[in-house]
Amino acid sequence: EIAYLRARDLKLGAAMERIGPIHREVDPDLFSSVIHHIIGQQVSMAAQRTVWQRLQAAAGTLVPETVAAMPAEALQALGMTRRRALYILEFARKAASGDFDLDALAEMGDREVLARLTSLRGVGPWTAEMLLIFGLRRPDVVSWGDLAILRGMRMLYRKRSIGQRTFQRLRKRYSPYGTTASLYLWAIACGALPELT
């Protein structure tokens, strides 16, 4: 993957060389991964971590049946909005009843997974793409909706902005290892190469 990306994009390749290996943390438990990502939407990582730890403590075992049995008020009391609590409950109930087959996602192509996940209330394209990366370990995901990826691209290529056309050109250049490129773009956006800030 790294050798391929280095050969396809000299700027990204040089950045990868300087940054070194990046470990991708994955969560193979798709049920908890969906909930974790719903909790993390538009909140700080610290807030996400706090609410997540509270949910784990309150639920004990994080399985569909346990979460589906929790009252919305109990979820809300953990530090999330009522709407987010309702999204999580609806998802947990669908997973518990079998109306949403999480295991089937592993057998689907990326587009089908995105369509299936975004059919859930509270799961938009960005959340679904993060689940492809961190839950299903898909190799070729670069999210247009991820502001840090766009910032990493702007920094790396010294651009004022990244439009849809430029983004698509870069995404195709990174393919079939877009996920690895995404990890490095996130690192760049977070200051891994101070000279680019």
Where would I find each of the regions flagged by the language model?
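C-terminal accessory module of base-excision DNA glycosylases/AP lyases that mediates lesion recognition
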Residues: 1-22, 86, 110-112, 125-197
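A positional/architectural concept
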Residues: 6-40, 44-53, 57-60
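Alpha-helical ds-nucleic-acid-binding substructure associated with the helix-hairpin-helix region
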Residues: 11, 43-121, 173
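Short, surface-exposed helix-loop/turn micro-motifs enriched in polar/charged residues
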Residues: 23, 47, 67, 102-105, ...
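Short acidic alpha-helix initiation/capping motifs at coil-to-helix transition points
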Residues: 28-31, 65-67, 106-109, 143-146, ...
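Non-catalytic, well-ordered alpha-helical scaffold segments
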Residues: 32-37, 49, 82-89, 129, ...
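A general alpha-helix detector
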Residues: 33-38, 54, 70-74, 112-116, ...
